[in-house]
């Protein structure tokens, strides 16, 4: 009986520790997402209308991309609905082709309607191979439009890479 109690206590402590570690990681990502939103709006004030009018959006504050012939990207982000955080998302991409370098970017995906946001949250959402992000420069977001219910923007943070595609990115979503 004593062994069972010790095992139960050990399991509880391990579960609590893992939960706290994940919670801290999520909190850090949420803080980074808020900073990323500020940076995006400072860089391209035209995004304000997307933040205000979209059904929801996901901000990936630190997407790492890299490759030489074979490349990949990954990042964690926060999903917002009506401006409020509702969950966490992660992004993965693997591709083969002419590419070289490495880059860190901020990526934001806006969902035009509730149906588009729900599709992201309930399916294993991914972009078609030809989809690309609008690389943000001052003023460019004013002319951007939704395509198939989404609008994607990327802001380079560091590094250099000759690839602006987001096609083939796969996402997963976990509600709070």
Regions found by a protein language model. Name each.
Residues 1-7:
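Bacterial N-terminal signal peptides that target proteins for export
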Residues 7-16:
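Bacterial N-terminal signal peptides
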Residues 22-176:
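Small-residue-enriched, tightly packed secondary-structure blocks
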Residues 17-21:
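Sec/Tat signal peptide C-region and signal peptidase I cleavage site
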């Amino acid at each position: 009986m004593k062994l069972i109690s010790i095992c139960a206590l050990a399991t509880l402590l391990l579960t609590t520790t893992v939960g706290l570690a994940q919670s801290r990681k999520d909190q850090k990502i949420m803080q980074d997402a808020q900073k990323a939103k500020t940076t995006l709006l400072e860089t391209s004030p035209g995004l304000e209308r997307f933040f205000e009018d979209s059904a929801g959006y996901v901000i990936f504050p630190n997407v790492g991309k890299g490759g030489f012939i074979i490349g990949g990207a990954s990042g964690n982000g926060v999903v917002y609905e009506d401006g409020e955080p509702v969950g966490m998302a992660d992004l993965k991409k693997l591709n083969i082709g002419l590419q070289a370098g490495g880059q860190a970017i901020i990526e934001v995906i806006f969902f035009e309607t509730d149906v588009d946001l729900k599709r992201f949250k309930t399916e294993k959402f991914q972009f078609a191979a030809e989809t690309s992000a609008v690389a943000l420069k001052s003023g460019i977001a004013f002319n951007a439009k939704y395509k198939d219910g989404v609008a994607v923007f990327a802001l380079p943070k560091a590094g250099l890479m000759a690839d602006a595609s987001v096609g083939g990115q796969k996402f997963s979503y976990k509600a709070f």
